[in-house]
Amino acid sequence: MKRFLDRRTILAVAVLILAPLLWFAPVILGGKTLIPADNLYQFQPWASLAGQYGVGVPHNELLSDLVLENFVWKSFLREAISTGQLPLWNPHLFTGVPFLAAGQHSALYPLSIVFYILPLPLAYGVFTWLQLAVAALGMYVFGRALRLGRAASAFAGLAYAFSGFFVVSVVFTMIIAAAAWLPWLLACIETIVRKQEEKGDVAYSPIPYVLGGAVVLGLQALAGHPEIVVITLLVAGFYSLLRLLVLWRRIGALGRAARLAGWLLVLVVIGIALGAIQIVPLF
């Protein structure tokens, strides 16, 4: 416990949480928003009012999905929740379409609570900050699981959270929400295998780490971007195979490696089951 509560660890965690806050301070603290509202003026009826309101060329017309879809989804969710309704059906498109089953609105994702309690222009900034912090902390934990030093792990966390992928995806909330959990899952896998390496041919129960990894995978499934879940499972599968082969070579016990492989499959099954409330209706 002392290892996780010393001052250097607390400092590293604080930096990883505050760095995204500093980056998005104009949105969270300065009254700005990530919602590209100016993109609406490319379309009627708003285009007819562009001159009247002094709206010129949009800052980035490729980001229209956020204001045309995601913002509308979040508004519909808030409306449904305020009236005590479960938003199973969207009556506003043609004769109506399934809504909750669609998934990309992230309605069931725990951190989406910020969209239900904060004004939407502010909520997008707060949500993005929290997700980048989750991503940074996850990579820090993965680095520590690999026995990297605190500084190296913190640098890895910053590099991941501020990577090109996250930077260009900040306006796609479901993408960053899902991708943020990848290093947490890898950290669970690494811990499960490394503990067996430390114990050699002596059996141990990895249940706490299996359950932790399952929760991580379930959260990722609820985030609303199944493509990221598929990519995560591929990465986790290849990483698990590599680590199990290394484990077999180091301790020379094929049975122990096979046993851990079974536990990792249990992790995936439980994780998918936790996210099934969103996955099953989607398909």
What is the role of each PLM region?
Residues M1-P26, L40-L49, R259-L264, V268:
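Start-transfer (signal-anchor) and selected internal transmembrane alpha helices
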Residues G30-G31, G84, K195-G200, W248-G252:
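Short loop/turn hinge sites at secondary-structure boundaries
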Residues F24-G31, I117, L244-W248, I279, ...:
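Transmembrane helix-loop junctions and nearby membrane-interface residues
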Residues L5, V202-P206, A253-A257:
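Helix-boundary and loop/linker segments of multi-pass membrane transporters
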Residues R3-F4, P98-Q104, Q220-V230:
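Short secondary-structure boundary segments
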Residues L16, V134-L146, R150-Q196, D201, ...:
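Membrane-embedded helix bundles of polyisoprenyl
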Residues R7-L11, F115, P119-F127, L148-A156, ...:
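Membrane-interface starts of transmembrane alpha-helices
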Residues P20-M139, L158-A180:
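Membrane-interface coil-to-helix junctions
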